[in-house]
């Protein structure tokens, strides 16, 4: 059994989702929550809350691998920069624990979870709920975090069947 932490980075709310995946690739829900960062006075303090929140989750749930959504190009350059900084803070928090990080674009995540790279957010939320047998509707950030974890679980399962690493199976170095 492997535990995967999925991260949907954000500068105000970061979604986190934790799943277990067995040797056959079957996934099960462990935990999900938003890390709400708005309680801090300024942006650097929000990034501190993000790093500390992820460190606490890693201590409590002990994931073995991390999957994170890649930054997309936002219309607002300031928002894109802040999103990139939040992503960097999240990656720093988990690599300090020596966890391997795997990155996936939003279109790759949608393709893996819904079967269509241009799927709507509601479709992702619905499919994640079905895949993990969840009875309550997920918030968007939690669904996205669980979706990136599920994507990595699928890539891992394919890689294992082919005798490759997850990076090799996805065509990455």
UniProtKB/Swiss-Prot annotation:
Q: Where in the cell is it found?
A: Cytoplasm
Instruction: Give the cofactors, semicolon-separated.
Output: Mg(2+)
Entries under PROSITE patterns matching the protein:
RUVC (PS01321)
What's the short name of a Pfam family annotated to this entry? RuvC
Which residues are noted in the entry as Mg(2+) 1-binding?
A: 8, 141
Q: Which cysteines are joined by disulfide bonds?
A: none
- Where primarily located? cytoplasm
The catalytic activity, as recorded, is: Endonucleolytic cleavage at a junction such as a reciprocal single-stranded crossover between two homologous DNA duplexes (Holliday junction)
Q: Which UniProt keywords apply?
A: Cytoplasm, DNA damage, DNA recombination, DNA repair, DNA-binding, Endonuclease, Hydrolase, Magnesium, Metal-binding, Nuclease
Gene Ontology CC entries for this record: cytoplasm; Holliday junction resolvase complex
User: Which Gene3D superfamilies does this chain map to?
Assistant: Ribonuclease H-like superfamily/Ribonuclease H
Which residue positions are annotated as catalytic? 8, 69, 141
Top-rank taxon of the source lineage equals Bacteria
Q: Which CDD domains match?
A: RuvC (cd16962)
Tell me the GO molecular function terms.
crossover junction DNA endonuclease activity; DNA binding; magnesium ion binding
- Give me the comment on cofactor binding: Binds 2 Mg(2+) ion per subunit.
**Biological process annotations from GO:** DNA recombination; DNA repair
Give the Enzyme Commission number.
Answer: 3.1.21.10
Per UniProt, Mg(2+) 2 binds at 69
In the record, the note on similarity to other proteins reads: Belongs to the RuvC family.
Q: What does this protein do?
A: The RuvA-RuvB-RuvC complex processes Holliday junction (HJ) DNA during genetic recombination and DNA repair. Endonuclease that resolves HJ intermediates. Cleaves cruciform DNA by making single-stranded nicks across the HJ at symmetrical positions within the homologous arms, yielding a 5'-phosphate and a 3'-hydroxyl group; requires a central core of homology in the junction. The consensus cleavage sequence is 5'-(A/T)TT(C/G)-3'. Cleavage occurs on the 3'-side of the TT dinucleotide at the point of strand exchange.
Subunit comment for this entry?
Homodimer which binds Holliday junction (HJ) DNA. The HJ becomes 2-fold symmetrical on binding to RuvC with unstacked arms; it has a different conformation from HJ DNA in complex with RuvA. In the full resolvosome a probable DNA-RuvA(4)-RuvB(12)-RuvC(2) complex forms which resolves the HJ.
* NCBIfam families per the UniProt record, alphabetical: ruvC (TIGR00228)
This one is known as Crossover junction endodeoxyribonuclease RuvC
- Tell me the classification of the organism that encodes this protein: Bacteria, Pseudomonadati, Pseudomonadota, Gammaproteobacteria, Lysobacterales
GN (gene name) = ruvC
């Amino acid at each position: 059994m492997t535990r995967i932490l999925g991260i949907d980075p954000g500068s105000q709310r970061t979604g986190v989702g934790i799943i277990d995946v067995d040797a056959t690739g079957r996934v099960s829900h462990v935990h999900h929550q938003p890390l709400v960062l708005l309680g801090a006075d300024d942006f650097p303090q929000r990034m501190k809350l993000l790093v500390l929140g992820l460190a606490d989750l890693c201590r409590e749930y002990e994931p073995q691998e991390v999957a994170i959504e890649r930054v997309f190009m936002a219309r607002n350059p300031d928002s894109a920069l802040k999103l990139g900084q939040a992503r960097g803070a999240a990656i720093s928090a988990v690599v300090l624990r020596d966890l391997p990080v795997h990155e996936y674009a939003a279109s790759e995540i949608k393709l893996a979870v819904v079967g269509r790279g241009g799927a709507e957010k509601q479709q992702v939320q619905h499919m994640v709920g079905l895949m993990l047998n969840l009875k309550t509707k997920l918030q968007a950030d939690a669904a996205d975090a669980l979706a990136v974890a599920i994507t990595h679980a699928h890539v891992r399962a394919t890689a294992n069947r082919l005798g490759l690493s997850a990076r090799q199976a996805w065509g990455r170095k």
